[in-house]
Every structure is written in C-alpha cells, then in structure tokens.
C-alpha cells in the first residue's frame, strides 16, 4: 500500500482483505501501517469450516473433508476467487512475528432463531454446533 509507516490507529476488515488476501502479506502490511498500540481487527471464516467444506464447495459437512495442517491457499473452486486461511498455531506465530498481541478471538455462534446471511438453514445449524466465522482482535505492541 503506498502509505507511510505508522499511518493508522485502526486496521479493520470484515472478511474481504483477510479472506482473499494472503495473510503472509496482509498481516505484515497491517503491522507496518499501524501506530504503536494500534488495533488490528478482522473477521473471516474459521479454519474448521475450511476443512469441512464439501469437495464442490457448495455446502459444509459434519466431517473433515480437507487436511487442517498445511492449509493456506484455497483455489480449487474454478471460477471463484482464491481464499486464504491458516491453522490456529500459524495465525498466532504470524501475529507474534509481526509485533501483535492477541486480545481476543471471538468464535461467532448465531443464537437460536437468528436472522442470518448464511446460504442455507443447514449452514446456520452447522454454525450453531461449530464455529463458522471468527473475529480476531490484536494490538500492535
């Protein structure tokens, strides 16, 4: 990004950049752009849901479909954008490596009867049993 270092107090993303951008590039860039004590917060799909998406990417399964370890780039759905995700240990290592302290990891669970933007009632039911989306809140130290 053509902006000076330490330009912002907050870097926030609701899916978007942290879903479709490589975290090995986006996390260091967020660290560069934040001032000391700046907030980095973003939401995206959980590593678990990435492991449980059907082979055709059309539905989420109640079983593991893909390996957890080694996940990074998901580009096997023709015609769809590339998505990125990492195992939890790798997220933590990446945040620490770039000077972040994790303040919170919120695993979103829709309440019973919630209005939702999930693609189907089956996805909503799945998200009531396992975390489908999460919110990270990290502080630059």
Which ranges hold each PLM region?
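A short acidic, Gly/Pro-enriched loop at the edge of an enzyme's catalytic core
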Residues: 1-10
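A short SAM/SAH-binding and catalytic strip from SAM-dependent methyltransferases
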Residues: 9-24
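A short glycine-rich, Lys/Arg-flanked "PGG" loop and its adjoining helix->strand segment in the class I
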Residues: 24-39
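Conserved class I S-adenosyl-L-methionine
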Residues: 39-72
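Acceptor-substrate binding/catalytic loop of class I
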Residues: 44-52, 76-90
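Short alpha-helix
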Residues: 72, 81-105
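Class I S-adenosyl-L-methionine
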Residues: 76, 108-128
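Core SAM-dependent methyltransferase catalytic element
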Residues: 98-101, 119-141
